[in-house]
Amino acid sequence: MLKDVTLGQFFPGQTPIHKLDPRTKLVLVIVYIVALFLAKWFVSYAAIAAFLALVIAMSQIRLKVVLKNLKPLLFIIILTALLNLFYGQGEPIAQFWIFKITKSGIQNAVFMVLRISLLVAGTFMLTYTTSPIALTDGLESLLSPLKKLRAPVHELSMMMSIALRFIPTLIEETDKIMSAQKARGADFESGNLLNRAKALVPILVPLFISAFRRADELATAMECRCYHGGEGRTKLSELHYQRRDYFAYLSGTALLAVMIVLRHFGL
């Protein structure tokens, strides 16, 4: 299950999506999320799915890799779908005890599954096609107006970038610890949910120790390279918008406009 989590991983490439300015991709992710929450009916979700499919195809990321992210969230997706299924309004189609299934409940459950799936797949494309360094530069550039309010923009961007970068590392470390515990007779897959949760307790201590050790090593490495925050720092290469970035902004604006029109007509 842990191996299916690919959040924070970067897949290098030279595709049009990889070459986009990180600021462009950050803004487009926000536009994508807004467009997704504007979706009201199957036509709207189909339009967003088509847009996402185009992005995935252009980035040359395998669809299997994108879909793997949904597996760890399967329990949450099913639970959310059931909550929407049994608490819909209208005439019941079927009823069991206090639970009733309505037409609106079925629609809401399907839409919620689509919304979560498209949201996860779409937002993960940002880390797949953007390196941690580029992501930090993009965030810092977009948040630069906050520097006038004396906000630590560079430090915040660096923290977010490091957090994303360490997610795959911690997942890999957890998998190694679990494999070592299994070799000693530990069982993480049998029993009820409470027993499985108790079986995970012995993993936490070595995982925290490993995380603190890696954090200390990273801090030492940054100090050795004379890193003292963003004040007075210069960049090897500055961010500049290219023609493809303006085309991407135009595509995002078009998607948002289409979603507004579809929502207006109830589609």
Residue positions per predicted region:
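Transmembrane helix-loop junctions in multipass membrane proteins, especially transporters and channels
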Residues: 41, 45, 60-64, 88-96, ...
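Alpha-helical transmembrane segments and their membrane-interface exit regions
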Residues: 51-61, 76-79
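Juxtamembrane/interface alpha-helical elements of multi-pass membrane proteins
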Residues: 73-186, 193
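Transmembrane alpha-helix interface motif
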Residues: 1-44, 48-57, 144, 148-151, ...
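Alpha-helical transmembrane segments and their helix-start/interface "positive-inside/aromatic belt" motifs
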Residues: 25, 64-74, 248
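Membrane-helix interfacial "entry" motifs
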Residues: 14, 37, 61-65, 96, ...
